[in-house]
Amino acid sequence: MDAKVMETFESWRANVTEEDLVKELGELAKPEAEDKLYDAFYRSLAFGTAGLRGTIGVGTNRMNVYVVAQATQGLADYLNAHYQNPTVALARDSRLKGEDFQKVAAGVLAANGIRVYVYPRIEPVPTLSFAVRYLKTSAGIVLTASHNPAPYNGYKVYNDNGGQITDEAAAEISANIARVNPFDVKPMDFEEGLEKGLIIWTPEEVLDNFIEAIKRVSIPGFKAADGYKVVYTPLNGTGMECVTRILKEIGVNDVDVVPEQAEPDGNFPTCSYPNPEFREALELGLKLADKVKPNLLVATDPDADRMGTAIPHNGDYVLLSGNEMGVLLMEWLLTMAEERGEKPQDKVAVSTIVSSAMPDVLARARGFEMRRVLTGFKYIGDQIDQLKDAGEEDRFLMGFEESYGYLVGTHARDKDAIVATMLCVEMASWYAARNMDLYEAMDALYQRYGYYLNGVVNAAYPGAEGAAKMAQIMSSLRKNPLETVGNYKVVGVTDYAECAEMPRVSGLQKEAPQTLPASNVIEYRLEGDNKVIFRPSGTEPKVKSYLFANGATREEAEARIAELSEAAQKVLS
């Protein structure tokens, strides 16, 4: 066993007092648990622009109260160095240990003289982004692991604009964290913080104003089609209150909530992987849908920043991909804007380099500007800020990621499943009044513009050996570029580690060309306007391969995706 790992382990055994963590340390001390001990202590959880994320447990490579305290002290040092009298907004989702972590984070901030606004109950991620902006705090923290399985939790940091922190801020906070001994951090008692006015319950008006901000992007004069019915599931997460409230306030009253998934439960007892993009997570919703026959099934993930849908079509339920929903919303919102007398060429939509190519085709046909940014919603938020700084915030049409994240409106700087659900319901009702479901609406767009399809190949590389393998794969793709992918010749390569120019299509393009930040992403452009992009996941030990193909028919495009998928698997094997 590595001597430094054992030194760290013994330090934890000497200092940890929490009963569950003490018990886990005892289990790790057994000879047969050597591999588990090593994995828990061989490194510290990496703090990046997405904060921290890991499985709950004891050790430097796990999420626990000591790691949360250490991270918060690093953040507190950063805030006190950059702000006079800094303040923070703090929230959590329904995950295990979330309340414990929230109290520790609030206590550390209070002990550093930083006033912190704490949501008194679980809340969706977008409400925290909104709270930072509404309360004008210096930063925000949300304790979440998005749609990861139940053993995970995380720690996500927002800047004073409600967006994820920059690479520079993350690097400085990370350096601060590295200097902190977690056992030297002494959080203020939560009740003491409340008494001293350093810990403040977030006022109810913040949530009320969040709902009002969302309603402002509702389609004017919206009225649900006669008999329109929705099935909704929050997947035992945070979306229940906000989603049901917003639907009621726009006049959608026939909403059936999946009862087994209505209440918050960090164990996620009904699905091991509460990710609304997968049919397995929607099984209970589909079962209820079979009984009540809705027009639409909507699911939000545990922190309610992502939304998935199932569409009743020809006696079955079809799941739309994140790309398809993004394209549908984009085209429909543009149509709604035109009906209000707004010009398409004035509008700006933003997506990522790994999302569908179809919005570029839409932009050329309809005249709006389409911008492509790096993966991560903070980059979409940056584009909103640029429009705001130019006095053109109203040009923002929408932003979306292929991973089921959408934002319409400028009330937040992160993806928002609450506003996405509202608009998806309105859009589906609009099409229903025209005797179309969303699957048929999407197919109509494919027939008009071409079948631009996508696929993803994930290759998992867990543990210390996995991290080295991931680095080796990306290095090899740079040093020994592919000449073909499947039967397709490579016609161009973009290495985003070299700060490539931001791709833009159509529109006014009044600003000078923008350069994207350096990122560990490699794009291979293939003949026939097909494409493959490789990048390591920012939150999981995986290398992802994003596949792009098009065809005159669905079958043709699907065959090309299958061929690219097989080739990508060989590259990642």
Task: Kindly give the residue locations of the regions a language model identified.
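An N-terminal, well-structured beta->alpha segment
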Residues: 4-105, 192, 199-227, 238, ...
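Gly/Ser/Thr-enriched, mixed-charge loops and adjacent short helices
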Residues: 12, 16, 20, 36-45, ...
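Conserved phosphate/anionic-ligand binding catalytic regions in large, soluble enzymes, centered on
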Residues: 41-61, 145-146, 234-242, 246, ...
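N-terminal small/polar loop signature for handling phosphorylated ligands or for N-terminal nucleophile
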Residues: 89-152, 249-309
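Active-site phosphate-binding/coordination module
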Residues: 127-185, 302, 313, 402
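Short beta-alpha connecting loops at secondary-structure transitions
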Residues: 154-165, 196-198, 266-273, 309-318, ...
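Phosphate-binding and adjacent anionic-ligand microenvironments
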Residues: 290, 294-296, 336-535, 542-546, ...
